[in-house]
Amino acid sequence: SGFGTPAAVAAPLMVAMGFQAAGAVMLGMMIQSTAVTFGAVGTPVLVGVQEGVASPEFLAMLTASGTSMGQYVNAVAVRAAVIHGITGTLMPTLMVVMMTRFFGSNRSWTEGLSILPFTLFGGIAFTVPYVMTAWILGPEFPSLVGGLVGLAIVSFTTRRGFLVPEDTWDFPDRKNWPSDWSSDLDKKSNAVGERAHMSSPKAWAPYLILAFFLILSRL
């Protein structure tokens, strides 16, 4: 992950699932928020903070206080995780509200709030392991571990109907979509035939293996 690839990958997948191209781009850009702090295995913090403050005067100040650069970077990571975790908890709700307001039949803000318990739960499922990982392991893994753990929790509970609202919401009929909602990708995705099926464990195996070895290297 990192360098904007999650949004670049997620938006076409959402279009293939039936989202409008404009809506998929909007949601993809919104989700590029909380996790970005520790994207690319912590590059913004590890490189940005260390290179940004590593002046002789600052290093001397750290030495005088008995703090190493590594300890300082980890402290920055924890504080950033807490601040961004608070806003990240609300991000799923904001995404749904924006979707119902700008891409729903009724153009309603409040329709999106009907799923508030579920979206708050989804946000917490990501941000709690996100903050804990920053505190325990440092800046390399909060986004990676938070995303994988959150996905596992929400997928498991959703299959069992936990906090899933009884009412369903959908986009307007495709024939009523304004022209600026769609792109050529919509037409191409509709024309794609059936592909070979891949099991979920096989599809997720590369990401899980990568996460395992990255975490193992820091223990």
Question: What do the predicted segments below correspond to?
Answer:
Residues 1-113:
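Hydrophobic transmembrane alpha-helices that form the pore/transport pathway of multi-pass ion
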Residues 89-219:
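Long, contiguous bundles of hydrophobic transmembrane helices that form the permeation core
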